[in-house]
Amino acid sequence: GVLRAMAQSLVHRGPDDEGIWHQPMRGVAIGNRRLSIIDIGGGHQPFVSDDGQIAVVQNGEIFNHVELAAELRAQGVKIRSGSDTEVILRLYEREGIACLKRLNGMFAIAIDDAREDALYLARDRIGVKPLYVMDDGRRMLFASEIKAFWPVPSVARSSPAIDLEAIHHYLTFNYIPAPWTVYQGVRHVMPGTWMKYTRGAPVGTRRWWNLADQREQDFSFEDWSVEFMATLDDATRIRLRADVPFGAFLSGGVDSSTI
């Protein structure tokens, strides 16, 4: 079907597994292509709540999922896998969309919640992982890459027009700033933002994280040095969690030489 064709167009992003979630009565369907890094055998997506009312998919990685899982288990929550995506599901069940603030990672997340008749789309704080939305006149579409929209018959027939405003921005700035894309009707979900849809119609957008809102600390240079090294050590440690072999690109610049 169309959803499987959309998912197959992203097989290069997730060559290891495919999952489909379909709620025909509500007109919701989600496809996922998975690159297996955490819990190879038990991380199939979408993750679905025990009552079948909530489904979660993500592209990315939640670096603090081990700590969050331990906290949830201490509160009596049953977690059946080692997957960071299941941790998102269990947190959402308890805290709703506010759970995003608990996540330390790079991610693009879709959460279908039949209880609210709502679909949430969310991106990480600075937008490491991409997420695009498109309204083709009949439905709302979302994907990690724009080309995943092309298998949809209505999109293929209409051949989305070039967005002249986006071209103006490109000629002015030498790039197209978000939320614009080169195509009319195709937009980025902004970093640090979630969007809520009901029956394909947007009903809310909220910035859940903003750098300008972060509190300034009145630290001395020595305090900042200690804080920086502690943060760097912790950031490196939690990014080394994987159930597959991993490597590192060391370019010789300031960042890789520091690590």
Locations of regions flagged by a protein language model:
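Cysteine-centered catalytic environments shared across enzyme families
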Residues: 1-259
